[in-house]
From Swiss-Prot:
InterPro entries: Na-dicarboxylate_symporter (IPR001991), Na:dicarbo_symporter_sf (IPR036458). Pfam families: SDF. Its main location: membrane. It comes from the Bacteria. It is found in: Membrane. It is a multi-pass membrane protein. Belongs to the dicarboxylate/amino acid:cation symporter (DAACS) (TC 2.A.23) family. The gene is tcyP. The keyword Membrane applies. The keyword Membrane applies. This is L-cystine uptake protein TcyP.
Length: 461
């Protein structure tokens, strides 16, 4: 370890101490995260220009910074499966009207899939409007390595037929899926939790005493898991600082500049899709301004943390402040982690498909091709994880199904973190919109709670 590496680590520790002081002074969580984001960008640029992105000093410094950044991501990954499982199961135990459960879950899943299909169409329109093509993107060493890695993953997936892939969604060994060992582990855990939830409803009708005991156990575990999530989320400012510093310091800024058009096109599509969410809320007879005010804190958190799973507790609390019953809020938030993510599983893979199409001789304006892309994107949106890598998995599924070279998806590695922030915020907005619209359609929405504009949930951890 050189003197310069030691100095860089000391500076990072000093910046973390500053964030800790802000926490002690009770500065709001959102402000602390945004401060960490800003400081990380500035510090990253400073390191980049002083040492150079490929220098030995930066390589060693990044390894040390990764203790905070990578450690934070690992902790989020640790809690995802227990969080998804207990949230789905808790949704069943918290439902007060059990006769509507099929309609409620069907509506939520239907809305998530439908909005993902719309998101795919928006992504296609944006890619065509900005004339995005993979042949216009330079391929450096990092992009080539990433492409080879994606190619290997794709080959592993292509070894199975479509019926076999559908069977793979089922939890043959739920304990294995709790480890996240398979690409479809998330949706498998959702299915397992749903089976337990349905079994609970049956026992509740015939043996209410045993069901009540099970409910208390689930509620207790739910409280413990949510507390663990809170403990992990307290590390968010430090994790964001380390991740952004490392990302900027090690990035090829020339590549980012060249991919600027893709970043702009992505955010244009994300904004259009967010407006569509607001239109859905408006057509449901609700004031979209109220939704914006109440949803802002959780969307900011999702944007800065880049974790739909980490945002789940705040997502559910925000839905409750919007008048969504607790059971529906749990369903919408939990399903939204693994089904129909508008940003990661909708817009992103659709844009990639349009970009790559000309390289394989496919006309991206062919109507039959466009409809195929939308259908494949919607179907493939099952099982996308809510922590890092979900968009990549969705892209692999879609491109493999369309017989396109997945290696070209590696060309976007340098701008992935920039786009992922917006995608995550849209994912969370999509799950909240599905819960809100479902509550309104089923007449379960507490309108007085929705209209109470003072009831705004802040991210407090």
């Amino acid at each position: 370890m050189t003197l310069f590496v030691v100095i860089n680590i000391i500076v990072m520790l000093g910046l973390m101490a500053l964030l800790y002081m802000m926490q002690k002074k009770h500065v709001s969580f959102s402000k602390r995260v945004f401060t960490a984001l800003g400081i990380g960008i500035v510090f990253g640029f400073a390191l980049h220009f002083i040492y150079g992105s490929s220098s030995e000093t930066i390589t060693q410094t990044s390894d040390w910074f990764n203790i905070a950044g990578g450690g934070y991501v690992k902790l989020l990954q640790m809690i995802v499966m227990p969080l998804v499982f207990i949230s789905i199961l808790g949704a069943f135990t918290k439902l007060k009207l059990t006769h509507n459960i099929g309609k409620i879950s069907g509506l939520i899943i239907g809305l998530l899939i439908a909005t993902t299909a719309v998101a795919a169409a928006v992504g296609i329109a944006s890619a065509l409007a900005f004339d995005l093509q993979a042949v216009h993107v330079d391929q450096g060493q990092a992009e080539t390595m990433r492409g080879a890695e994606l190619e290997q993953k794709s080959q592993d997936m292509e070894a199975k037929t479509l019926p076999q892939q559908i069977v793979e969604l089922l939890p043959g060994n739920p304990f294995l899926d709790f480890t996240g060992a398979r690409p479809t582990s998330t949706i498998a855990v959702v299915i397992f939790a749903a089976f337990l939830g349905i079994a609970y409803l049956g026992v509740n009708r015939k043996q209410p005493e045993q069901a009540e005991l099970f409910k208390k156990m689930v509620d207790a575990v739910y409280a413990i898991i949510m507390r663990v999530v809170t403990l992990i989320l307290r590390l968010t400012p430090y994790g964001v600082l380390a991740i952004m510093t490392k990302t900027i310091a090690t990035s090829d800024l020339d590549s980012i500049a060249k991919l600027g058009k893709f970043v702009i096109a992505s955010y244009a599509a994300l904004i259009v899709m967010f407006i569509i969410h607001l239109l859905l809320i408006t057509f449901s007879g609700l004031n979209p301004v109220t939704y914006l005010k109440k949803a802002f804190p959780v969307l900011v958190f999702a944007f800065t943390s880049r974790s739909s799973a980490g945002a789940l507790p705040l997502n559910i609390k925000t839905q409750r402040s919007l008048g969504v019953p607790e059971g529906i809020a749990n369903f919408a938030g939990s399903f939204g982690l693994s089904i129909g993510q508008n940003g990661c599983a909708g817009i992103y893979p659709a844009m990639l498909a349009i970009m790559i199409a000309p390289t394989v001789g496919q006309n991206p304006l062919d109507p039959s091709f466009l409809f195929t892309v939308i259908a494949v994107v919607a179907i493939s949106s099952f099982g996308v994880a809510g922590v890092g890598g979900g968009a990549t998995f969705a892209a692999l599924l879609v491109l493999s199904a369309l017989n396109m070279p997945v290696a070209l998806a590696g060309l976007l590695i340098s701008v992935e973190p920039l786009i992922d922030m917006g995608r995550t915020a849209l994912n969370v907005s999509g799950s909240m919109t599905s819960g809100l619209v479902t509550s309104k359609v089923t007449n379960e929405l507490e309108k007085d709670t929705y209209q109470d504009r003072t009831n705004i949930i802040e991210a407090e951890v």
